[in-house]
Amino acid sequence: MSKSRLTVFSFVRRFLLLLMVVLAVFWGGGIALFSVAPVPFSAVMVERQVSAWLHGNFRYVAHSDWVSMDQISPWMGLAVIAAEDQKFSEHWGFDVASIEKALAHNERNENRIRGASTISQQTAKNLFLWDGRSWVRKGLEAGLTLGIETVWSKKRILTVYLNIAEFGDGVFGVEAAAQRYFHKPASKLTRSEAALLAAVLPNPLRFKVSSPSGYVRSRQAWILRQMYQLGGEPFMQQHQLD
């Protein structure tokens, strides 16, 4: 290998190491800061906003109103747990059984990919990472998930998740969603309304709270049944999530 190539390789290696250190400090600081401070915006919100501007849509505003857990209806927390991650209170960030099932499903159905992300993983991804699928992003997501599971309580993870989750085009967080779709604060959401909001979470840009399809209504009904099976509102108190 020539001297010039060695010099370039050495420069690239040092640059990548420096970048990794900077990102580690940035993400570590973010995890520490947001363990107590409200989250002003997420990586997904920034990505959506920049994308809108690049496409000439200057009226788009990625909007979120931070609220604490005691300002959110217990039904809302229960609904997203029932819909997205029923073992949330038990696992350490990853649901191994669900991952194994998803891998087996994806091997059989290459055109219908199924995910197995927990609420903790989704929080890490939405807060700190870009959208998309890649092994690099999944690796970073795993590290960030371990970080927030180590530093944050389960209640804090759920609080952040509910405040940065996307519920529609430009609608981020449960408070903005409650005001937009039901004209009420998140604290007043009913069991049925909470289940409807949770029903669109797999793809809030495709599934609409304002005009729910038959599939969304079916998923809402399923979520309501799962909420009942989990034990209803007392579930949140029993696991110190309210």
Curated annotation (Swiss-Prot):
Compartments annotated for it: namely: Cell inner membrane
Q: Which GO terms describe its cellular component?
A: peptidoglycan-based cell wall; plasma membrane
Bilayer topology annotation: Single-pass membrane protein
Q: Name one Pfam family in it.
A: Transgly
**Which GO-annotated molecular functions does the record name?**
pentosyltransferase activity; peptidoglycan glycosyltransferase activity
**Alphabetical list of InterPro entries matching this protein:** Glyco_trans_51, Lysozyme-like_dom_sf, PBP_transglycosylase, Pep_trsgly
Give the chief site where it resides: membrane
Q: Name one GO biological process term.
A: regulation of cell shape
Q: Which HAMAP family match?
A: PGT_MtgA
Please state which protein family the record places this protein in.
Belongs to the glycosyltransferase 51 family.
Query: What does this protein do, in the record's words?
Result: Peptidoglycan polymerase that catalyzes glycan chain elongation from lipid-linked precursors.
What the entry lists under NCBIfam families is as follows:
mono_pep_trsgly
Q: Output this protein's name.
A: Biosynthetic peptidoglycan transglycosylase
The gene designation is mtgA
